[in-house]
């Protein structure tokens, strides 16, 4: 069975409204804390005429309510009438609609129940529109759902809120029309003064942080930004001015030119201004380029080459000093950069860097660089040039140009690259031709003059927004000038108000204000927010969800109608603000004959307007606005609506970079969009003549306004709150705008009976909807929803008579008997009063801040006192004219919206409909609930599921425990068992004994083998060494003639067949071996020319006993060589055989022959033998020390890692199981806490306790097993050591146990590894023996230290390990693995910088590529790391190195210092280091035999042809030497011969099937090595890979 879950959601519309209310309260607080900004415009008469006409039409038609609400009063009441008709005559219902999205999914569930027993379905029931039919469908389908998981979501969307919101928005619009009654349009005071403040702050900051005075800052910034149209914002221009002043020290005209050019480049390149400033500063300081010249240079390069890699500005900043040293002009720099870029350079930095490198090298010449100059110009011209470098007669740019020109004439690309790299640096290796193009470009200078101005003009001309942007700049300039003037002029007024506020009298007055306002807020709080508490108290009751909707909405509207009118009404007290703006803005009435700046601006404005005609959007007159954009925004008209939307989306409307106040007035200001004002001025409103001149209603001069105020007189009454301010006296007379605040005093002291009169008498004090809405929202006993509607309409009319009419009208009585009846409300809003008090607590805190904010907001009271009375009377007359209009409308409203019978009918219909829809939803829920109860909320259902889970978990734990027991017992029986270890040692001992026995046997056989070998020595020479190189193949054409090489040469070799390259100076031992092989191929034999060898030998023989004594301390099995006298016997036998023949044929001195041909060679052999032994010992030691057993790796992978993996994963298994279960459990509200505690929590707790024991037991047993068996392991190790020592003592008669253990320690390690893991390796022995080829190749094995050095360098340079073989090959060929090697013979050494170290790098290459901190060229790791860096930069990969590439293609390593056999055509370097070599063609021709004889002679040997008669026996010289046999000294070396057999422990195994084969191979390897050493004399190492 599956799970079924139903979820009903009540869409929370109330919370969003509450958040809006909270935001209103916060804005109210900010308004009280911030400055009060008033704007006024006189449009009363026109609006009143429109209202009067519309009211007449309303009364003429028979309708319940003919009052429409629109967001633009200007559109006329025609739209209002249509909207009102829709509102009053339509059916007002709260529509609960259903959108059935569940049916399709239910059909799928019903059709697939047989296959979906464990599936998971989530049908969603979204209740939206027209519920009845859909709810029936849901009920039918739910009955079909069984064993599934469903989540129907019932969403109740109240469409009433949207309708009421629309009404509210239209009321707000109507209020806005009245609030802006006296707004003159144009500039808001907030934006003007904010602009002035921002400008003054910028100029002060720049002046304080630079060397420019404030006056010059303002003048230069305005000239650049406003007049020359440069820069993105005034602030950006001023900061650029500061940067350039600080970085260059320029002033006056030079600074202004730098700033303007820098700003234009920033716009042209769309670059960061600060980055442009840095580039200009560097060019000004180093190249002495003016702002205009720098701008022209950058603009020219940018137009012709772009901004390569975005580094043009950075290049100018970084390399200006290099350009200065080279004495380059701006035109030359531009031309060079463009040429180099078009030639293929990646960026400007590479080009400039090559210039800097050349400039350094031309003044600090090394020998190789001098040679490069001589190659290009000749010695004589080079000398002149160097002289010119020193005395300055040849500049850097001239020398670079000449070098580039000379290089272009070098046809050989390789030679050109070598010279250019030497003179220009490594950038040439990367770029090549672009460097030369750049250098040649220096020869000419680009014409950059005027480039910046042309590009900037084209940018402006092609931008369609340029006129708009220029208009905005003009407006910003005007706004800045006005704001600066206002802030400067109001300084004394602020001083006066500050003095009053800080005086004792002022403090007392403010305390009284605070107390009275707090009392007003408390009284309001008694009836505020009654709807919200009811919603909170009953929100969780799902069954009454529909009943909550309608009351909550009504309460919501009430809440909105309280705070908004309070905010806007109190925040805008004094609709007489028209006088404020008129007074602050100087009179600009045009006068004939004047020529002031203001007059010129007005004249131009009028002229432009006249040319545009009636369609002009720019109003004429002194207060006209620019065309572009909206300067101010009104929260109660189009601008305000859009502004609210923008704020809701989290967006802010800001100026480009300046102060936000440039575009946005503060939140407390009431403003109107310039677009609406323009329509007002042009007269394009609904119901009016678009061509009618409305300027008379807009342009009201200060004198006209003043006269109107005087004529009307003042009738304001002062209330309680601000009454103390009436007696402010001389302090208040000097504070502007204080009179406006005094107007609000008429509002204080009102009560339930006289509220209408009090609010109405304020006139413009609470303009617009604030007046009417306050009637319905603020005063106790008056309802909110209808009061707000009435207040919105009443506020449009104004006047104290309106308030009186409402106080005494039947409207209020009707309202009190319906919506405002205590009993009627108490039935629907239980528990509201207590919550209202808590909701209004913030108001008292808000008003408490008024005291502090008055200090910084009220202005000159004296000015206001003089003007207030006239303005007040004038405003009162305007309100009275609207009062009569209201009387005609009042009757219609009374019979509809304020009729108890009318409302009663509407409410009953809504209530009954909502109840019927909820009943349908309830029945659906009952059906769903039944299904859920039988599955997710059924203990029986859960019990079935849990049992299977529980049993499965138990089985898994049982299996885990049994597995661990098996593992534990297995470990205890093996690793911790003394018996087990003893068995393993036995198998190791058997292998060791077998090997030792074989070695011993070899030792015995070597002596006899040596005898046979000596006897067959000459036979080997005759028969050749075909077993190494195979038999000869078919000979190619005989075109090669061979030759003798005495100096390094590049030559074709092997082009006509096989050839031998035989060294005669570098490695004579190998040369002899190759000579013997070459002779064999040519059908010849080689014998030692004793005379030549002895005469060239130079070093006398030393005592063989002394030499051998130096190497008797061996670390390998030692072979007795005392039987060398047997070799002498073999020689003697051959001497005797032909002795008589020699006597008869030759008359010689027997004593001399004996000394030359027998004694000297034997002594030489004895003298050489210690070296052979020493090399064998050292090689063996290196092989042993570089070979690991792999025990650590085995234990890590086979033992430690499996356990660690289990530990790592166990946490995720446990956490995943618990988290998954918790997620499933918490997603369903089952109410089965007791069941879960019993069947889930406790079993898991028990599992947790048990598993803790299992885990600790597992690890504990493992540790205890290791520790408890420690003694047995120690004993086994001791026994192992004793047995190894004993075996070696007994078998080989060795008396140095420590050395024995050191030498053969790895056999024990191998045995341990094989005991842990026996592996059959079928071809092990063959693979090991195959490594002997390394000995014959002359390369030998790389020592362990070299390998470690190279691996360390590879890791330091983060190079792939695949480079190791190639690097080892290079190290072996270049230095032979010697980190201290220094080459003193090649061309580098002659030039003064020999190649050194492991990889034979020269100092300059090492320094160019060494890693930080690796500065020792003789340190092998440092040297190898630098070589790797050089290979990467030069060849990219190790496989591209010539020597490695040659070997990869089957050829030899490039360079033949050791000689070798050439089997195919190739190009190679021979005679390296001026070492002599012979190249001998492998053919039986005269040339080949001649060259072979010459090579043998150079090596102190002779060549014989066995095919000639008489040559089958010894030569006469050899026979003569035998006559000294009676004096022959038989010698016996007391030393030994050591052979290195290298093993790699990771590949050696032991088992029965391959033991004998392994031993045999080892024996054979020993025999082969010894035979090779005797016959050839090479230095070989038996390397077992």
Swiss-Prot record:
Q: Does the keyword Phosphoprotein apply?
A: yes
Q: Which residues carry this modification: Phosphoserine?
A: 970, 972
Compositional bias, Basic residues, is annotated for 645-655
**What is the disulfide pattern of this chain?**
none
What residue spans carry the Polar residues bias annotation? 618-627, 661-672
Q: Which UniProt keywords apply?
A: Coiled coil, Phosphoprotein
- Pfam families xrefs: PhageMin_Tail, SLT
Give the residue ranges for region: Disordered: 586-627, 645-692
Q: Which residues form the signal peptide?
A: none
Coiled coil, from the record: 12-59
Q: Which InterPro entries match?
A: Lysozyme-like_dom_sf, Phage_tape_meas, Transglycosylase_SLT_dom_1
Sequence similarity: To B.subtilis XkdO.
PANTHER family in UniProt? CHANNEL_COLICIN DOMAIN-CONTAINING PROTEIN, MOTILE SPERM PROTEIN
Q: What is this protein called?
A: Uncharacterized protein YqbO
Q: Which organism is it from?
A: Bacillus subtilis (strain 168)
């Amino acid at each position: 069975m599956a799970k079924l879950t139903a979820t009903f959601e009540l869409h929370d519309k109330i919370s969003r409204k509450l958040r809006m209310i909270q935001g209103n309260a916060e804005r109210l607080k900010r308004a009280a804390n911030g400055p009060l900004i008033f704007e006024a415009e006189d449009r009363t008469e026109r609006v009143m005429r429109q209202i009067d006409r519309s009211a007449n039409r309303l009364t003429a038609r028979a309708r319940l309510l003919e009052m429409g609400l629109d967001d633009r009063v200007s559109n006329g009441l025609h739209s209002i009438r249509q909207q009102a008709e829709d509102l009053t005559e339509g059916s007002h219902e709260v529509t609960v609609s259903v959108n059935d999205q569940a049916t399709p999914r239910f059909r799928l569930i019903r059709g697939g129940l047989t296959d979906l027993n464990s599936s998971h379905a989530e049908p969603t029931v979204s209740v939206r529109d027209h519920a009845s039919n859909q709810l029936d469908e849901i009920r039918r389908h739910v009955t079909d759902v069984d064993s599934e998981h469903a989540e129907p979501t019932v969403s109740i969307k109240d469409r009433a809120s949207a309708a009421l919101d629309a009404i509210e928005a239209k009321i707000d619009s109507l209020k806005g029309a009245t609030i802006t009654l006296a707004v003159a349009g144009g500039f808001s005071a907030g934006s003007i003064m904010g602009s002035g403040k921002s400008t003054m702050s910028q100029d002060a900051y720049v002046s304080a942080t630079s060397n420019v005075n404030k006056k010059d800052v303002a003048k230069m910034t305005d000239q650049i930004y406003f007049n020359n149209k440069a820069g993105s914002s005034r602030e950006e221009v001023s900061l650029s001015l500061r940067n350039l002043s600080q970085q260059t020290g320029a002033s006056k005209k030079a600074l202004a030119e730098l700033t303007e050019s820098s700003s234009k480049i920033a716009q042209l390149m769309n670059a960061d201004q600060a980055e442009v400033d840095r580039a200009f500063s560097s060019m000004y300081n180093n190249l002495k380029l003016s702002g205009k010249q720098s701008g022209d240079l950058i603009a020219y390069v940018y137009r012709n080459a772009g901004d390569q890699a975005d580094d043009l500005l950075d290049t100018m900043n970084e390399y200006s000093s290099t350009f200065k040293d080279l004495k380059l002009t701006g035109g030359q720099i531009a031309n060079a950069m463009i040429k180099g870029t078009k030639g293929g350079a990646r960026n400007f930095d590479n080009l400039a860097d090559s210039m800097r490198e050349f400039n350094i090298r031309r003044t600090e010449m090394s020998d190789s660089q001098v040679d490069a100059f001589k190659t290009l110009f000749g010695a004589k011209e080079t000398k002149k040039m160097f002289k010119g470098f020193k005395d300055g007669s040849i500049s850097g740019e001239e020398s670079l140009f000449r070098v580039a020109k000379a290089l272009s004439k070098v046809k050989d690309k390789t030679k050109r690259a070598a010279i250019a790299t030497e003179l220009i640096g490594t950038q040439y290796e990367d770029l090549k031709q672009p460097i030369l193009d750049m250098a040649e470009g220096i020869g000419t200078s680009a014409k950059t003059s005027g480039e910046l101005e042309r590009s900037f003009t084209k940018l402006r001309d092609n931008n369609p927004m340029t006129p708009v942007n220029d208009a905005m700049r003009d407006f910003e300039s005007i706004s800045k000038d006005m704001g600066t003037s206002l802030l400067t002029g109001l300084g004394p007024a602020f001083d006066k108000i500050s003095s009053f506020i800080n005086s004792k009298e002022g403090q007392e007055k403010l305390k009284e204000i605070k107390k009275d306002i707090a009392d007003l807020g408390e009284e309001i709080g008694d009836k505020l927010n009654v709807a919200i508490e009811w919603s909170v108290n009953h929100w969780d009751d799902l069954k009454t969800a529909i009943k909550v909707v309608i009351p909550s909405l009504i309460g919501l509207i009430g809440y909105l109608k309280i705070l908004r009118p309070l905010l806007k009404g109190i925040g805008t007290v004094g609709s007489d603000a028209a006088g404020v703006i008129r007074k602050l803005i100087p009179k600009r009435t045009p006068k004939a004959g004047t020529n002031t700046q203001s007059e010129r601006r007005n004249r131009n404005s009028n002229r432009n307007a006249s040319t545009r005609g009636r369609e002009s959007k720019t109003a004429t007159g002194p207060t006209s606005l620019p065309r572009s954009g909206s300067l101010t925004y009104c929260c109660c008209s189009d601008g305000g609506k859009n502004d609210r939307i923008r704020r809701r989306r989290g967006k802010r409307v800001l100026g480009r970079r300046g102060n936000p106040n440039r575009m946005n007035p503060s939140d407390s200001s009431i403003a109107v969009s310039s677009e609406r004002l323009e329509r007002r001025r042009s007269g394009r409103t609904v119901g009016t003549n678009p061509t009618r001149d409305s300027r008379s209603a807009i342009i009201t001069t200060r004198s006209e306004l003043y006269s109107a105020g005087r004529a009307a007189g003042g009738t304001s009454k002062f209330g309680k709150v601000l009454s103390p301010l009436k007696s402010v006296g001389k302090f208040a007379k000097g504070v502007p705008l204080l009179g406006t605040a005094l107007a609000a005093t008429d509002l204080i002291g009102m009560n339930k009976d006289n509220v209408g009169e009090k609010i109405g008498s304020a006139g413009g004090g609470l303009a617009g909807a604030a007046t009417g809405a306050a009637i319905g929202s603020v005063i106790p006993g008056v309802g909110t929803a209808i009061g707000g509607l009435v207040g919105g309409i009443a506020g449009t009319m104004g006047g104290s008579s309106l308030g009186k009419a409402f106080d005494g009208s039947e409207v209020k009585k009707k309202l009190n008997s319906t919506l405002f009846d205590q009993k009627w409300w108490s039935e629907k809003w239980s528990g509201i009063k207590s919550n209202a008090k808590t909701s209004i607590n913030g108001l008292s805190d808000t008003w408490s801040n008024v005291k502090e904010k008055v200090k910084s907001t009220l202005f000159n009271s004296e000015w206001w006192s003089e003007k207030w009375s006239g303005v007040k009377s004038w405003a009162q007359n305007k309100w009275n004219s609207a009062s009569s209009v209201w009387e005609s409308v009042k009757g219609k409203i009374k019979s509809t919206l304020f009729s108890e019978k009318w409302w009663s009918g509407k409410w009953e219909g809504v209530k009954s409909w909502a109840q019927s829809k909820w009943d349908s939803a309830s029945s659906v829920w009952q059906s769903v609930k039944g299904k859920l109860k039988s599955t997710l909320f059924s203990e029986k259902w859960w019990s079935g599921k849990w049992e299977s889970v529980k049993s499965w978990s138990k089985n898994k734990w049982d299996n885990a425990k049994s597995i661990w027991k098996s593992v534990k017992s297995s470990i205890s029986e093996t690793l911790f068992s003394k018996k087990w270890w003893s068995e393993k040692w036995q198998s190791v001992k058997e292998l060791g004994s077998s090997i030792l026995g074989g070695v011993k046997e070899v030792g015995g056989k070597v002596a006899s083998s040596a005898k046979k070998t000596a006897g067959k020595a000459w036979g080997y020479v005759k028969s050749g060494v075909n077993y190494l190189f195979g038999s000869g193949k078919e000979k190619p054409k005989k075109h090669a003639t061979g030759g003798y090489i005495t100096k390094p040469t590049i030559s074709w070799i092997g082009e006509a067949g096989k050839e031998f390259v035989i060294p005669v100076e570098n490695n004579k031992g190998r040369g002899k071996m190759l000579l013997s092989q070459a002779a064999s191929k040519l059908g010849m034999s080689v014998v030692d020319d004793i005379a030549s060898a002895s005469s060239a030998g130079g070093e006398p023989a030393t005592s063989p006993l002394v030499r051998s004594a130096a190497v008797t301390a061996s670390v390998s099995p030692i072979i007795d060589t005392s039987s060398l006298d047997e070799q002498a016997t073999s020689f003697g036998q051959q001497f005797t055989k032909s002795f008589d023949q020699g006597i008869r044929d030759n008359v010689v001195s027997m004593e001399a022959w004996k000394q030359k041909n027998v004694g000297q060679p034997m002594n030489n052999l004895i003298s050489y033998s210690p070296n052979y032994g020493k090399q064998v010992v050292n090689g063996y030691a290196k092989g042993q020390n570089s070979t690991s057993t792999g025990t650590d790796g085995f234990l890590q992978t086979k033992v430690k890692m499996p356990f660690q993996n289990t530990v790592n994963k166990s946490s995720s298994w446990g956490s995943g199981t618990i988290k998954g279960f918790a997620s499933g459990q918490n997603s369903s509200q089952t109410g089965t806490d007791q069941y879960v505690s019993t069947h889930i929590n406790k079993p898991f707790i028990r599992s947790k306790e048990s598993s803790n024991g299992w885990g600790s037991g597992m690890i504990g047993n493992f540790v205890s097993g290791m520790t408890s068996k420690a003694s047995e392991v120690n004993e086994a190790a001791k026994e192992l050591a004793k047995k190894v020592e004993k075996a070696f003592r007994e078998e080989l008669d060795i008396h140095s146990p420590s050395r024995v253990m050191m030498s053969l320690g790895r056999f024990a390690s191998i045995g341990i590894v094989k005991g842990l893991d026996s592996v059959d390796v079928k071809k092990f022995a063959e693979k090991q023996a195959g490594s002997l080829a390394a000995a014959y190749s002359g390369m030998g094995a790389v020592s362990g230290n070299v390998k470690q050095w190279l691996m360390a360098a590879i890791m330091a340079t983060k190079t792939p390990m695949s480079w190791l073989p190639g690097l080892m090959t290079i190290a072996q060929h270049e230095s032979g693995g010697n980190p201290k090697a220094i080459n003193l013979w090649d061309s580098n050494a002659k030039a003064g910088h020999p190649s050194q170290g492991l990889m034979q790098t020269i100092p300059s290459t090492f320094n160019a590529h060494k890693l930080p901190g690796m500065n020792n060229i003789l340190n092998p790791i440092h040297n190898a790391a630098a070589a790797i860096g050089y290979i990467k930069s030069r060849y990219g990969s190790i496989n591209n190195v010539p020597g490695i590439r040659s070997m990869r293609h089957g050829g030899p390593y490039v360079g033949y210092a050791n000689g070798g056999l050439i089997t195919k055509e190739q190009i190679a370097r021979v005679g390296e280091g001026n070492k002599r070599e012979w190249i001998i063609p492998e053919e039986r021709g005269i040339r080949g035999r001649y060259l072979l004889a010459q090579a043998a002679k150079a090596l102190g040997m002779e060549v014989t042809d066995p095919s000639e008669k008489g040559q089958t026996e010894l030569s006469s010289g050899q026979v003569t030497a035998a006559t000294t046999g009676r004096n022959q000294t038989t010698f016996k070396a007391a030393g030994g011969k050591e052979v290195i057999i290298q093993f790699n422990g990771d590949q050696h195994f032991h088992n029965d099937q391959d033991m004998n084969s392994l031993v045999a191979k080892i024996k054979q390897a020993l025999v082969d090595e010894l035979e090779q050493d005797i016959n050839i004399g090479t230095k070989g190492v038996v390397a077992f890979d």
